[in-house]
Amino acid sequence: MLAVPNMRFGIFLLWWGWVLATESRMHWPGREVHEMSKKGRPQRQRREVHEDAHKQVSPILRRSPDITKSPLTKSEQLLRIDDHDFSMRPGFGGPAIPVGVDVQVESLDSISEVDMDFTMTLYLRHYWKDERLSFPSTNNLSMTFDGRLVKKIWVPDMFFVHSKRSFIHDTTTDNVMLRVQPDGKVLYSLRVTVTAMCNMDFSRFPLDTQTCSLEIESYAYTEDDLMLYWKKGNDSLKTDERISLSQFLIQEFHTTTKLAFYSSTGWYNRLYINFTLRRHIFFFLLQTYFPATLMVMLSWVSFWIDRRAVPARVPLGITTVLTMSTIITGVNASMPRVSYIKAVDIYLWVSFVFVFLSVLEYAAVNYLTTVQERKEQKLREKLPCTSGLPPPRTAMLDGNYSDGEVNDLDNYMPENGEKPDRMMVQLTLASERSSPQRKSQRSSYVSMRIDTHAIDKYSRIIFPAAYILFNLIYWSIFS
């Protein structure tokens, strides 16, 4: 019975001791700090104590706070993008919004005659004012953004008329820039490469001059909603002085503005970037005109080759004709198949005609020579003194002798060492004088020989003179 009260008394003493210990810790905090120092401060508390000590010890090394870590207002909130409907143009329901444009041409990459297009890389900049994007600023500084903000606000919907391919450069990121002034003025710039159509006239090719245009227009907004204009007039177009092309000389760049009408939608403002190109002729002189001229001159060589040298004259004529055909085919392969005659076609085909006529000239000479040889054979058969002689021994009857030379044979006297064949020819010609019929046969025979020689002789003068005259007329018209 006495054990139960003693147990209760012991429990009471333990509880009272725990209360006293708790009260002592609450009234003596320095002791707790002292005890924690023995076990070690927590990591965060030690860092804070170290920083405070560093600031107190070296105030010179004290750094300003990093503003990027402080909470800032988002650009979307500053521009109040969520408070407006940017699917509508600025000033909707009012007058047309003016949008200025300027362009800097970076490069003119290529001109294709076959596809009738050109490729250009340029910086396209738009200027307009959108009061919905105005923001308060104490220093009147603009804000610059990349392409991510462009998708959240209104921008002009420009496109290139008659473009075949175009893209915005994206290396290393999208080449798009947006700059907003505190009063709401916006600059929108992007770097674009576009391939556009260019209607070319090749009637004077390769002595031609081409004018191409890059046309810029709003796709959806008519002139009642958007007024498109060159911001600085002709100064709105800037070009790099280093721009050059292999086959063309860039003569000038200039700008124009016109209105375009579509029956379904109405009138639109359209901006033009016009540039004039003049073709370099030196390349075509080396590749086309000089080879064609040389082939024509080479065909004239046959006029100085003996008419009996068939293996020499025929291959020469065929070679020049085939070479001219190859030149014509090569030029037309690099050109579009137009339905009109080009200047180079006139020159090449006239040259081809000259080469072909030289072949026909030899065909005529060879034919007349063959006919003449047949008549010679008949004449030898009719002459009694030469009928038994072989053809080489009748060379005295060659047409190189005139009538006077033939008559002089009457006075011919054989000298020592003279062959008797020549004497027989002399006697034959002398006997012909006593017969009027044989005299007429001899005259027609000699005249025939002179005519065949005259074709080659006159061709040596007529062909070069006619070709030189053609060149004078051609270059005076097209140059």
From Swiss-Prot:
Signal peptide: 1-21
Residues carrying a glycan: N140, N234, N274
Pfam families: Neur_chan_LBD, Neur_chan_memb
Cytoplasmic side: 302-313, 367-457
Reactions the enzyme catalyzes: chloride(in) = chloride(out)
Binding site for 4-aminobutanoate: R125, S189, E217
Localization, UniProt: Postsynaptic cell membrane; Cell membrane
Record keywords: Cell membrane, Chloride, Chloride channel, Disulfide bond, Glycoprotein, Ion channel, Ion transport, Membrane, Postsynaptic cell membrane, Signal, Synapse, Transmembrane, Transmembrane helix, Transport
Regions of compositional bias (Basic and acidic residues) in chain numbering: 45-55
tRNA processing recorded as keyword: no
Main location: membrane
Membrane topology: Multi-pass membrane protein
Disulphide bridges, residue numbers: C198-C212
GO cellular component, one term: presynaptic membrane
Record topological domains on the Extracellular side: 22-280, 335-345, 479
Classification via InterPro entries: GABAA/Glycine_rcpt (IPR006028), GABAAa_rho1_rcpt (IPR008058), GABAAa_rho_rcpt (IPR008057), Neur_chan_lig-bd (IPR006202), Neur_chan_lig-bd_sf (IPR036734), Neur_channel (IPR006201), Neuro-gated_channel_TM_sf (IPR036719), Neuro_actylchol_rec (IPR038050)
One GO-annotated biological process of the protein: gamma-aminobutyric acid signaling pathway
Notes concerning its domains: GABAARs subunits share a common topological structure: a peptide sequence made up of a long extracellular N-terminal, four transmembrane domains, intracellular or cytoplasmic domain located between the third and the fourth transmembrane domains.
Protein family membership: Belongs to the ligand-gated ion channel (TC 1.A.9) family. Gamma-aminobutyric acid receptor (TC 1.A.9.5) subfamily. GABRR1 sub-subfamily.
Quaternary data: Three rho subunits (rho-1/GBRR1, rho-2/GBRR2 and rho-3/GBRR3) coassemble either to form functional homopentamers or heteropentamers. Rho-1/GBRR1 subunits can also associate with alpha-1/GBRA1 subunits to form a functional GABAAR. Interacts with SQSTM1.
Protein name: Gamma-aminobutyric acid receptor subunit rho-1
Organism field: Homo sapiens
Gene behind this protein: GABRR1
